[in-house]
Amino acid sequence: MIAQRAALIGAESWPRQPLLIPAVDAETGEPIVWDAAAGVPLVRAVAASSAFPGAEPPVTVDGRRYLDGALRDGTNTDLATGAHTVVVIDPLAHRHPRSTTDGAHLVAADPGTARLLDAERSDPEAWTAAYQAGKARAGAAAEELRARWRPATDRG
């Protein structure tokens, strides 16, 4: 799984921009949030934060086993406290409606795409249709975000 995540993210070192990666201790249920200062390799933090029970095994970091940060909170928007702009991309938001941090903009599947996402998962045609619908939704979401987004120079 570590190698898969390394290939997926295409980077070995933490970015210069602030990045917080949440996970959950598999034994205690305690949440943890890693950043560049934590001393955890980026790829290992990403792998731990995406180790969902039943799909991937927990990932060991500093002798502890960790699971997907979504088990802490599906969106983790509380980690963005103080941010000017927060964008939450949650294509499955229709399954588990929840509130987001004040000011956060939620990008979710429209009703038609949601139906496709909920279709029979073993049908490759359903995946293709869901992918195409997601691409179309991304274009609409980009326009919505463009209308809301203000560059730092416009914030005063």
Show which residues each predicted segment covers.
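Patatin-like phospholipase
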Residues: 1-156
